Amino acid sequence: MFAAHLTNYAEDGHPTEQHAAYYEARARGGAGLIITEEHSVHPTDWPYEKLIHGFDESVIPGYRRITEAVHRHGTPIFAQINHNGGQASGMYSRLPVWAASPVADPMFREVAKEVDHAEIAEIVAGYALTAGHCVRGGFDGIELQCSHSSIVRGFLSPATNLRDDEYGGDLRRRARILLEIVAAVRDAIGPRRALGVRLCGDELIAGGTTIDEAVEVARLVESAGQVDYINTSIGVATSTLYMIEASMHIPPGYALFIPSAIRKAVELPVVGVGRFKDPLQAERALAEGHCDLIGVVRGQIADADFAAKARSGHGDDIRLCLSCNQECVGRMGLNRWLGCVENPRTGRESVALASPARARRRVMVVGAGPAGLQAAIAAAGRGHQVTVHERGDTPGGQVRLAAIVPSRAEFGDLIRNQLAECARLGITITCGSGVDAAAVRAAAPDAVIVATGAVAERPYWAPAEAAQVVDVRQVLDGSAAPAGRVLVVDEIGFHHATSVAELLADRGAQVEVVTPGMVVGQDLGITLDMENWCVRAAAKGIVQTTDCLVTGVAPGSVTLMHHPTGRSWQVAADWVVCAVPAAPAEQLYLDLKALGPGAGPEVHRAGDCVAPRRAHAAVIEGQRAGEAL
């Protein structure tokens, strides 16, 4: 099952051709059931720009494009409908947000308007209206989002429902709006279409819904006799989002206790979710009786053919999700359309695939990091004969180093997946072979793609004779072994500094991380890693110092400056580990370009040797370079 998740593909409140292509790719790839992203049921619900306005009749033609595309492959598709309630802002709607009680959401920090009885009736009618639009648009069923971000969740939760009328108080009264919505939607869609409810099993907040109450809600839903299945979730999107879309720091199947408990209490089919990245994990959850269906979202974002490969016994060919959250969850939080670090097709399904090359060419790729390997895959996919040359002993580039950190080991699946694809395409990879311009000319390929990565830059404040100043890469590759008092300098704001800080703390070092930013590893918030990093850092005694620049280093000490005030002081440090921007390793590319037209092969470059960035840029750029040949 391809469960509901945000995509940010909507335009002006309407579904797009990209929606149709995106969902069709998963239907073609064997998904047994698709549930779309949420569709808003009322004008007061517009928490983010690219939300589908299901309450507006003009969405129906777009719905039909989606359902027709999916039905071509025999796959049923449901629409999820929702009102986010107080977990929102009036920024886009220019209206007050509606909720059970006037409680300010911890993320949006906007006090909601407590809905009166007439407004509750308006919301219920909005669900029915939107469900009717979905039926007219060809959807096979409706899922009511009542879990991690929903006005219904707000009513169900004792933490956000402070009412003392018939919609507040005990659980049955708090569930009244849910049962009214169920009845109204069932009446709107008729008896032949499916109706599901997605419930939050544990909000993980003080005074919130717990698993025991969630089980009772499931019983109430079943007793209504109008619902066909129950889907599950964990956490609250604006308080404990890091538990809903868990990164690699949280084990697969972590939320299975929720469907397991609900399944014991009801006869309805129950859906389980929670970082299922491998078919074997899903099969085990089913075999052990935790649930009746498995929702796999990021796994099918990473590989649209996940289900078909699993069904045909080719599970080893699946491009496993990294659970890195960089291009899926991370892009959503930045109001960008959904993508994937390792699947350059995600978000571009509506763009035509590259056609086979007119003539087979001999292509040399220099560098076997994510950019070089993806370039090789793309070029070979067009029919070219491809060889990859890697200077080091092992493919992987900076990803291989990042995966050395135990808590980041799954990131190495990016390279494992690429190497498996290279093997299937017959790409030759030679390691331990440094290549210069003369070697390229001697090999005489028709085209060369330079993907030589980046090199560490030494900060201006670190003189060459300061032997105790090293780069994070030297720590990861083992060429430097800092110990004692270690100062880690974070000028990148991502996993570079935090991963090495943890690694050194685990080895017994006394670690302090200093950053010019307001928080250490500031972009960890985008990938939902910040909360877990802070917990682990505190447990390991890692000191975090913010708003500070390093201005000098001397034996045994480092000078810091608090940039808001200009105050300077010295801290003791035996070693300084730098996580600072790198420089492109572009010499080979420049040498080849300097040969001039006709004096050498066609030359392209990709990845960090263009400009040092993160893995997603390397993969996308590698794909483009390979497709250009």
Identify what each model region corresponds to.
Residues 1-366, 370, 375-381, 385-386, ...:
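Flavin-dependent oxidoreductase catalytic cores
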Residues 169-170, 347-357, 412-413, 474-482, ...:
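Surface-exposed acidic, glycine/proline-enriched linker/cap segments
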Residues 558-562:
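SH3/SH3-like beta-barrel fold
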Residues 397-443, 524-551, 556-557:
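N-terminal Rossmann-like dinucleotide/flavin-binding domain of flavoprotein oxidoreductases
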Residues 361-389, 395, 430-444, 451-525, ...:
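Rossmann-like dinucleotide/flavin-binding elements
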Residues 32, 140, 228, 292, ...:
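Conserved acidic residues
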Residues 242-248, 292, 399-407, 522, ...:
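Short beta-alpha connecting loops at secondary-structure transitions
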